[in-house]
């Protein structure tokens, strides 16, 4: 594990300790991302309100440490497999939206945070006949999916 990964893991542990949550934190290096897996009793606290606390924690980690990574990967913070499930749900929704775009023209998805937008763009890129574009000036942007 690299120094930046250790620092990111330590930050997550410190934030959880400050919230008085005794949870386990494991940093896993994968080809796509550096995953910070949180587990243990009480993890549901991070998943309330559609995982907003988990999203915020992921944004903080990426803002603080992503630029120190030697490649273009980012950090993915997951708790009790919640993010993994939501990611697959978003991929399925993107594929469905791509099919609609093929039949009836450009389709919008959003507003989406940067992590979700990246996932949508990567899913669309799997089909060479389709393209995607983010529009908007705010943190949450809309993704337009259309045929090339």
Residue ranges: model-predicted function:
Residues 1-148:
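RNA-contacting regions in translation and RNA-metabolism proteins
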